[in-house]
Amino acid sequence: MKIYIDFDDVLCETAEYFTKIAKELFGIDVPYRQVQFFNLQKSFDLNDEQYEALMKAGHLAENLLKYEETPGASEVINKWVDQGHEVFIITGRPFNSYEPSRQWLDEHHLERVPLFCV
């Protein structure tokens, strides 16, 4: 079986980290559990300039590497690979974030899983 897994907010807790960035950059304090929209610009009530700054900061290598793994994700994925399934990680992250995203996967014992930026 082929299994495709989204990176952000499936494999790792991306939105939770973005709440920290929004607070650091703009003093906007929206607790993670209160993020109501996939559109973070709307969730944090940001103007276009602020949203662009948030996205830029969130995709810096030093930030990407700090994202917490969704509990149990790597164990489940490795089990699927061990069972013979073809597993792929898919992300809408900008292509220039490929290397740190690949590093994050490798550091979380997902070296056998290909990564695709779409």
Located regions from the model:
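Active-site neighborhood of HAD-like aspartate-dependent phosphohydrolases
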Residues: 1-53
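Conserved aromatic-histidine-acidic binding/catalytic patches
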Residues: 6, 10, 65, 93
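Short, glycine/charged-enriched secondary-structure capping and boundary segments
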Residues: 18-20, 102-105
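Short loop/turn segments at strand-loop or loop-helix junctions that form parts
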Residues: 56
